[in-house]
Design a protein with these regions (language model features):
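Thiamine diphosphate
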Residues: 1-112
Length: 112
């Protein structure tokens, strides 16, 4: 799928994430389109921070945020997802785009 088609299908206007080479086309598109813009695109220090930023965006606007990351960062989102996205707590909706590292049969670095 082309990045432009993905962006159109998501119908979102706020993205936050940790850049990943597997998601380079998406990262390049976001930088070209928004740069670093607190209203549309924030690069955070780790994936858990991204979830917190995205949750704040949703609370302020009511819109669905998008978080992008590589799968090695999933452990960093456990606490914010369990506390902020849980339907019995804040029930914040969020879209995740997660790159897949460590695919069987493919040589790949665990992180970069």
């Amino acid at each position: 799928m082309k990045v432009e088609s993905l962006i159109e299908a998501l119908n979102a206007d706020f993205y936050t994430g940790v850049p990943d080479s597997l998601l380079k086309p998406l990262c390049n598109y976001l930088m070209h389109t928004y740069g670093i813009d607190r209203n549309h695109h924030i690069i955070a220090a780790n994936e858990g921070n991204c979830v917190g930023v995205a949750a704040g965006y949703h609370m302020a606007t009511g819109k669905y945020p998008v978080v992008y990351m590589q799968n090695s960062g999933e452990g960093n989102i456990v606490n914010p997802v369990a506390s902020l996205l849980n339907e019995k707590v804040y029930a914040i909706p969020m879209i995740f785009i997660i790159g897949w590292r460590g695919e069987p049969g493919k040589h790949d670095e665990p992180q970069h």
